């Protein structure tokens, strides 16, 4: 029997706010354990939560960018469970009335476009973190670090529309790109800023009844998500075919073995005894507020890619690379604003700029060659002042100092030679010294042409205008 996977993803997005969702404590990562806490974080009796307005704004941004309906009224609820990293004994989340509902994202897998529904986006606080290691003054054991408690999260819940690990990864990558573009999340998966719970079940092909699902918790890389889902699909099919039954449970993924293992029985919503939080009034969001937030949204990657293709004539590949990050897209846009030709700017941003950034181990936001200076360099190429090859030498010089490209060209005597008389003289000398190759060319061996071009460029120290060289050389070789 053939089986079809049914996958739904719950993505936790840690918001890039300076302070926590219900108090004024810092959200900075990596601080000393329990150094960023207060009575609210610690769940002290009588401590009252106060909602961070920036968290609501970020949630609205996420909802608009994923085509959701923004609820005019939403409610916070207490999710009750006991765990050492949850000192209150409940987590403040949203249940029946989340802030965003009924959205979607379109993904592309193997050239096919597919729409993945988004059930809801809700705001919640994160829990603390258990630390299993040597604890100063206590020896080996387990401790609780509550710095992360009350850190603001969005939980983005997809519909069970995903049918393969590849579709899941495509959806996650698109969602990750959007939240980073919006500036609401740093996207650091290693630090847990963007992590995923994968709900997986299988059913016979053609069936409309979903199988029993398992939930694999807190997978924090695209590669691990793919491995975890593929393993779980294979495990469930094998179990069913051997006459067993899939148990609804929570599982953990082991990146070393590439396998999932049982963690605990899967809870249902009623197990958490949700009820409205009496310390937080319902959140009312006006249409004007939503409209103001909508005006602040950046142009999103998909819209930008479409514009680059239709308005600038760039290829699908170029548009994809240039919009990979908001910083790169904005650098490219700044080049265009300074007067750079679109295709030339695209080639240089994807080529020399990216190469130099990778070698320096830095991001484009810290690029020492500003868009304006790069544009000035490209304009020298367009005017024929320097060749593309010489431009790379000039660019390397620009990387190490703040001189204008014109000044570097002048100082180093790199102006391109377009004087036909000077170039003809070089060609004549090279042809006279290589009559054997001249005869080969005239005998039909056209590959020899490249040899002569190389000799001329070498003799001119790379300064000869390649277009002029090709034209004159071809004319002389043909006699």
Curated annotation (Swiss-Prot):
Reactions catalysed: L-glutamyl-tRNA(Gln) + L-glutamine + ATP + H2O = L-glutaminyl-tRNA(Gln) + L-glutamate + ADP + phosphate + H(+); L-aspartyl-tRNA(Asn) + L-glutamine + ATP + H2O = L-asparaginyl-tRNA(Asn) + L-glutamate + ADP + phosphate + 2 H(+)
Methyltransferase keyword on record: no
GO biological process, one term: glutaminyl-tRNAGln biosynthesis via transamidation
SUPFAM superfamilies: GatB/YqeY motif (SSF89095), Glutamine synthetase/guanido kinase (SSF55931)
UniProt-recorded Gene Ontology molecular function terms: asparaginyl-tRNA synthase (glutamine-hydrolyzing) activity; ATP binding; glutaminyl-tRNA synthase (glutamine-hydrolyzing) activity
Source superkingdom: Bacteria
EC number: 6.3.5.-
This protein's UniProt keywords: ATP-binding, Ligase, Nucleotide-binding, Protein biosynthesis
A Pfam match: GatB_Yqey
Subunit composition and interactions: Heterotrimer of A, B and C subunits.
Function: Allows the formation of correctly charged Asn-tRNA(Asn) or Gln-tRNA(Gln) through the transamidation of misacylated Asp-tRNA(Asn) or Glu-tRNA(Gln) in organisms which lack either or both of asparaginyl-tRNA or glutaminyl-tRNA synthetases. The reaction takes place in the presence of glutamine and ATP through an activated phospho-Asp-tRNA(Asn) or phospho-Glu-tRNA(Gln).
Recorded family membership: Belongs to the GatB/GatE family. GatB subfamily.
Protein name: Aspartyl/glutamyl-tRNA(Asn/Gln) amidotransferase subunit B
Organism: Geobacter metallireducens (strain ATCC 53774 / DSM 7210 / GS-15)
Gene from which the chain derives: gatB
